[in-house]
Every structure is written in C-alpha cells, then in structure tokens.
C-alpha cells in the first residue's frame, strides 16, 4: 500500500468511493471537488495495482480568531473513507495520520476533526492525538413563523457573521470554505438565511430543519429557528449553541481551543 497526496487524476475514483461510503448528494460533491484546491487537499491510499483503497481530506479553510487579536490556522480532517474490501487493515488510521501531517505542512497550528459518532472520539485520539473538546448544546423549536426569512449569498452571510461575532473567540471561514458550507446546505433543501435579528445556516432532514449555525444580535434564537422551519416546510427546528461547560462533544482537537469558541460551521 502507498499513501500520497491526491492529484486531479484521482478525483473520479475518490468521488466514486465517497458515494459508496457516505451516499452523498451529487450536487454537494460537484461543489466540494470544485472547491477542494481552494479549501485544502487530500491523501489517498493505493493498492499494489494502483487501485484506490481509501481517502481522507485535509481542509485548511478555517482560522481561529481570538478576541485578543491573535489568530491560528486550523486543519480539519474530513470524510475519512476506506473501501469495504480494504477495511480492518489499519488504512483508516494511516490515512488520518497522513492527512493530519498534511494539515501541518500547510501551516495549520492545530489539527481538528468532527467524529461521526461517539466511539470515534477515542479512535481519533489514538490515531492523531485529538483529545481536547469543544462542546455544544442541542435545542428544538416547533415550527412557527413569527419573523420573515430571507436567503443570503455567501458574501452577505460572511459579512453578517463577522459582525455578529465581533468581540468573541470564533472560527473564521475562508470564502471558498463558506461556499462549501452553502453548497452542503443547499444540496439538502436549505441554505444561508437571515431574519431581522439573526443569521442561520440550515438544511432539511426529513421533517426537521437542522440549523447548523444560528447567530442572534439580541433576540431568542428559537424564534428565528422556528420561523425558518415553518418557511421551509418542516415541523421543527433542531439548533445548536456553543457550550462553555457540559453539553455534547462536538469538535475534537490536538490542542485546546478556548471554551465557548464559536465554530458551528464544520462540514458534517
């Protein structure tokens, strides 16, 4: 087996593997692979005949912005995938280590990831040393339209977001990374939105609206989340807020991020 950084010639096989493992929307995959050179890179594992055994993505379009003005680039491991016939051979761990190292070579000070489920937090800690957590709290709101919702472009959302997060520790997204976030939301029936008091990024999951980020100037986030759910034909909204203590595990990192750091917009 050989692990190396991907080349454009690898993309068709990488897309096919992604579809088999994650059953992802073609709309999102089109956008993701178009944006990949601007948001990071990837590593691939190849068999003896050059066949693709697995892939992992090393994304670097995130910057930790602290209220004291200091900044640090974050690397983010995403979509580690191994073909079914090549599993249980340590390929996933090897790809994760290679992707983490690629993040560091691309000047990331901290390597992070969002494990898909609970047992994977320990798996990633063993593989790449990610033992520090950001946590969040989940909330629900029944659909009820009390404020108007308007759709935003990526540029509009970025400007609103930066303004609402001024004076807080937060993770800034590069514009191409924000476009990847928008593509993910729109591929599943959502997008980037604003009310008179808030901005939110959301997508549909059946009858639920999954609000991946909601930022309010002063009001109750449940009001805007409920209105967005009603506007998009959902029965309820599930939204998440950063937790300074307690809450459910969210992003895990190989160095500590300040409690309450606002990230929200990872790639799920």
Each model region followed by its residue ranges:
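Active-site rim helix/loop that mediates acceptor-substrate recognition in acyltransferases
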Residues: 11, 16-66, 165-192
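Conserved beta-strand in the GNAT
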Residues: 44, 51-61, 74-76, 81, ...
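Core nucleotidyl-transferase/polymerase catalytic module
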Residues: 45, 75-79, 117-121, 132, ...
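Conserved acetyl-CoA-binding loop-helix of GNAT-fold acetyltransferases
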Residues: 79-82, 88-103, 219-230
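Conserved GNAT acetyl-CoA-binding A-motif
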Residues: 96, 103-116, 233-242
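Conserved active-site alpha-helix within GNAT-family acetyltransferase domains
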Residues: 105-109, 116-135, 244-258
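Amide-forming acyltransferase catalytic core, primarily the GNAT-like/NAT-type
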Residues: 129-209
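Charged, low-complexity intrinsically disordered regulatory/assembly segments
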Residues: 202, 208-268
